From Swiss-Prot:
InterPro entries: G3P_O-acylTrfase_chlp (IPR016222), G3P_O-acylTrfase_N (IPR023083), GPAT_N_sf (IPR038114), Plipid/glycerol_acylTrfase (IPR002123). One of its GO terms (molecular function) is glycerol-3-phosphate O-acyltransferase activity. GO terms for cellular component: chloroplast stroma. Belongs to the GPAT/DAPAT family. It catalyses: sn-glycerol 3-phosphate + an acyl-CoA = a 1-acyl-sn-glycero-3-phosphate + CoA. PANTHER family: GLYCEROL-3-PHOSPHATE ACYLTRANSFERASE, CHLOROPLASTIC. One of its GO terms (biological process) is phosphatidylglycerol biosynthetic process. Residues 1-96 form a transit peptide. This is Glycerol-3-phosphate acyltransferase, chloroplastic. The keyword Thylakoid does not apply.
């Protein structure tokens, strides 16, 4: 329900040399508006305790210990692409129907779905997806052990189904650079509240919190920060924000993500994407799915790169990138999850983009472990509407010190070797951090999994 990784496209000669990326260029998940300091009116999200209440569309949300992860799947039956060609940009997502907001019970929710299908205003395949998501989300949240699980599920699912139905009737159109929609409905808070009860915060960790604080200081100085990261689930953006929001709310709210077309077209994903800052591109893994659309996709991706370049020139930008080109998958033989290899050209393209932007830039390797919460299909699928699995589980993120291209490649004999060495250094750091998170969360070692390289903490406490 949130972002995916990478895009491939050829760049026209009109693009400046430093923007001429190879046909393996990845998805860039990118950064906030130009002002660093939030105003007093900017909504804030903090981790809610079991006695606190949430703003926006959801009730109090929290995590609690569960005996074991609870997983349930949802498979939208058909392609869920919503046509938006007749909709003006950014006009949707502002009003609401009362079909779901008036619901007082689970029975009312399902009756509302049936009513809209019979009225011809809700496609049957989307309705089926709604019902399955409700049931599977409910199972996962109940497994968390929260005594108010049913209340949480009803509140959050009413909010989600209302937004999905609104988008089906009036599709939201994403611009190449999409800024998170925070009013009149706060989609960011909505997404945080929806994913929060799926995270076992007792078994969640942040690695090297002082480095995240260091990044915020550099942003204040006008520097650009690039996070080269592995990518695990559609929920990655929410997981990152949830683990940082208590201590570093600005970073949590202002990361910008380069999103593939799938998460800005699937009705069940779009409400979560609307709440994030995005650079919208076409994924390289799906670039050739329809030969007739290849040129259009490449042109759109060039526009997205120009938007990225403009953002970086402003400085104080925080960019999250998945240079693997997509989500991690388990090894076919061992079934173990490991970070997918980084695409060398993707890493180098982003490095050059940052170097030519003007303000100082820093590249940090970041690891994320959260695949149990919303694991992807075992293989890449062409059709929109993948099978989704929803679980209650621990999660973690970790960042290592920035890696300098010039220092890392000082002894390299040629540019191609330098690209390879730099990409490998980033990937190796991500893998090392990932293994620490894995030991802490899945190996149940907790803080004892900390190493001289990765110090684990729980900054929400």
């Amino acid at each position: 329900m949130s972002m995916t990784g990478s895009s491939a496209y050829y760049v026209a000669h009109a693009i400046p040399p430093f923007l001429r990326l190879s046909n393996k260029t990845m998805l860039l998940l990118s950064t906030p508006p130009t002002t660093f300091f939030p105003t007093s009116t900017t909504p804030r999200v903090t981790l809610l305790s079991s006695t606190s209440s949430s703003s926006s569309s959801s009730i109090s949300l929290r995590s609690s210990t569960a005996p074991s992860p609870s997983c349930s799947s949802v498979t939208p039956k058909d392609n869920c692409l919503a046509s938006a060609k007749h909709s003006p940009p950014n006009m949707s997502a502002s009003v609401s129907s009362r079909t779901f907001l008036n619901a007082q019970s689970e029975q009312d929710v399902f009756a509302g779905i049936k009513k809209e299908v019979e009225a011809g205003s809700l496609p049957a395949n989307v309705a089926a997806g709604m019902e399955e998501v409700y049931n599977n989300y409910k199972k996962a949240v109940i497994q968390s052990g929260d005594p108010k699980a049913n209340e949480i599920v009803l509140s959050n699912m009413i909010a989600l189904l209302d937004r999905v139905f609104l988008d089906v009737t009036d599709p939201f159109v994403f611009q190449p650079h999409h800024k998170a929609k925070r009013e009149p409905f706060d989609y960011y808070v909505f997404g945080q509240n929806y994913i929060r009860p799926l995270v076992d915060f007792k078994n969640a960790y942040v690695g090297n919190m002082p480095l995240f604080i260091e990044m915020e200081e550099k942003l204040k100085q006008g520097h650009n920060i690039i996070l080269m990261s592995n990518h695990q689930t559609e929920a990655d953006p929410a997981i990152i924000s949830l683990l940082l929001e208590t201590r570093l709310p600005y970073i949590a709210e202002n990361l910008t993500y380069v999103a593939g077309d799938r998460v800005i077209t699937d009705p069940l994903s779009k409400p979560f994407s609307i709440g994030r800052n995005l650079i919208c591109v076409y994924s390289k893994k799906h670039m050739l799915d329809d030969p007739a659309l290849v040129e259009m996709k490449r042109t759109a991706n060039i526009r997205a790169l120009k938007e990225m370049a403009m953002l970086l020139r402003n400085g104080s930008q925080l960019v999250w990138i998945a240079p693997s080109g997509g989500r991690d998958r388990p090894d076919a033989q061992t079934r173990e999850w490991v970070p997918a290899p980084f695409d060398i050209s993707s890493v180098d393209n982003m490095r050059r983009l940052v170097e030519h932007s003007g303000p100082p830039g820093h590249v940090y390797p970041l690891a994320i472990l959260c695949h149990d919460i919303m694991p992807p299909p075992l293989k890449v699928e062409k059709e929109i509407g993948e099978k989704r699995i929803i679980c209650f589980h621990g999660a973690g993120i970790s960042v290592a010190p920035a890696i300098s291209f010039s220092e890392t490649t000082a002894t390299c004999e040629n540019p191609e070797k330098a690209k390879e060495v730099f990409s490998k250094a980033l990937y190796n750091s991500v893998t090392e951090q990932y293994n620490v998170l894995k030991s802490a969360i899945q190996g149940k070692k907790g803080f004892e999994a900390s190493t001289p390289v990765v110090t684990l903490s729980q900054p929400w406490k």
